[in-house]
Every structure is written in structure tokens, then in C-alpha cells.
């Protein structure tokens, strides 16, 4: 019943947790819509946000931090080529205005990521200043979140 699912929090606890922990694991209702309130709240206090999907990323640390090759479909008519693209985070961080509080990388469909990939996302904000990472790792009836490091350790234990 998402229409009756009232959020008692106005987003301030979420923003405080994002600023404190820098990487957050999020569970949102599968119908969607509620997480947009939290994205709007982050943008309202000065963060820039970018939403990407976890499906098809490949090596996440290489995709975000290093130059990586992309092979377009050739359909048998052309030769096989590889285009080199710059790191995604470099593109976003270079265009970040000086007045911005930081940059939030919001990753949807994070349930397809392995524990190793989630662990690499935990350390990402320490490597890149002004970066916050939010990963939607599953769905739940109500929206809830916890530090990504804590969520990864619980997933590793099987809880």
C-alpha cells in the first residue's frame, strides 16, 4: 500500500547519514517514487546527483576511476573496434561547480552487484573527495537505509 505509506521523516535523518557515512545501502518499495523525495532533499542542500544502473557496468572501479574500452556492436559488416572512454567520475567531478556541496552517485538495481563490487563502492568516497555513494540493494515495504559497510558485512554473514 504505497499510497498509505507515510514517511514520518522529512529526509533530514537520511541526509545526516549520507554526510556521516558517505556510502549508504538503501531498500526502497518496488513501486518506486519515495526515493525521489530523498534525491530532491539532497539536491536542495547543494549536492549534485547522478543516477546510474548497476546492470551492465562490468568492473565498477575501472568504469568509475579509470579509462575503459567500449566495443560497439559490429553486426558483421564492419571491423571490430574499441573506443576508449574517460572515467565516469572524472566527467562528473570536473563539471561540479565550486559552490556544490558534493556529488552523489545513486546506483539503482544494486542487488545484481557482488559482495566484492559492493566492498569496492564502500571505499570509493575515501578515494574521491566530495563523493557520496548510495546503492539501492533491494526492495522492502518501507524505505530504509544503513551504512553500506554494515550492509555488506551482514550480507557476507548471510543475514
UniProtKB/Swiss-Prot annotation:
Q: Which reaction does it catalyse?
A: a plastoquinone + NADH + (n+1) H(+)(in) = a plastoquinol + NAD(+) + n H(+)(out); a plastoquinone + NADPH + (n+1) H(+)(in) = a plastoquinol + NADP(+) + n H(+)(out)
The superkingdom of the source organism is Bacteria
Which parts pass through the membrane? none
Keyword terms of this UniProt record: Cell inner membrane, Cell membrane, Membrane, NAD, NADP, Plastoquinone, Quinone, Translocase, Transport
Q: Does the keyword Cell membrane apply?
A: yes
Annotated membrane topology: Peripheral membrane protein
Name the enzyme's class.
translocase
Q: Name one GO cellular component term.
A: plasma membrane
Q: Which GO terms describe its molecular function?
A: oxidoreductase activity, acting on NAD(P)H, quinone or similar compound as acceptor; quinone binding
Q: Which coarse location class applies to the principal site listed for this UniProt protein?
A: membrane
Among the Pfam families in the record, one is NdhN
**Enzyme Commission number, as recorded:** 7.1.1.-
Q: Where in the cell is it found?
A: Cell inner membrane
For whether the record's keyword set contains GTP-binding, the answer is no
Cited PANTHER family: NAD(P)H-QUINONE OXIDOREDUCTASE SUBUNIT N, CHLOROPLASTIC
What the protein does comes down to: NDH-1 shuttles electrons from an unknown electron donor, via FMN and iron-sulfur (Fe-S) centers, to quinones in the respiratory and/or the photosynthetic chain. The immediate electron acceptor for the enzyme in this species is believed to be plastoquinone. Couples the redox reaction to proton translocation, and thus conserves the redox energy in a proton gradient. Cyanobacterial NDH-1 also plays a role in inorganic carbon-concentration.
Describe the protein's quaternary organization and the partners it interacts with. NDH-1 can be composed of about 15 different subunits; different subcomplexes with different compositions have been identified which probably have different functions.
The record's family statement is: Belongs to the complex I NdhN subunit family.
By what name is this protein known? NAD(P)H-quinone oxidoreductase subunit N
Gene name per UniProt: ndhN
Amino acid at each position: 500500500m504505497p499510497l498509505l505509506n507515510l514517511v514520518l521523516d522529512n529526509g533530514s535523518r537520511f541526509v545526516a547519514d549520507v554526510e556521516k557515512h558517505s556510502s549508504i545501502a538503501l531498500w526502497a518499495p518496488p513501486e518506486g517514487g519515495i526515493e525521489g523525495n530523498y534525491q530532491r532533499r539532497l539536491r536542495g542542500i547543494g549536492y549534485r546527483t547522478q543516477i546510474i544502473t548497476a546492470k551492465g557496468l562490468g568492473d565498477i572501479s575501472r568504469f568509475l576511476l579509470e579509462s575503459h574500452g567500449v566495443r560497439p556492436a559490429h553486426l558483421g559488416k564492419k571491423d571490430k573496434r574499441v573506443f576508449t572512454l574517460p572515467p565516469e567520475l572524472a566527467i562528473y567531478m570536473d563539471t561540479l561547480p565550486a559552490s556544490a556541496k558534493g556529488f552523489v552517485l545513486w546506483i539503482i538495481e544494486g542487488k545484481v552487484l557482488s559482495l566484492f563490487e559492493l566492498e569496492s563502492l564502500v571505499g570509493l568516497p575515501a578515494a574521491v573527495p566530495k563523493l557520496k555513494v548510495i546503492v539501492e540493494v533491494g526492495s522492502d515495504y518501507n524505505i530504509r537505509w544503513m551504512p553500506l559497510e554494515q550492509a555488506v558485512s551482514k550480507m557476507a554473514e548471510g543475514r
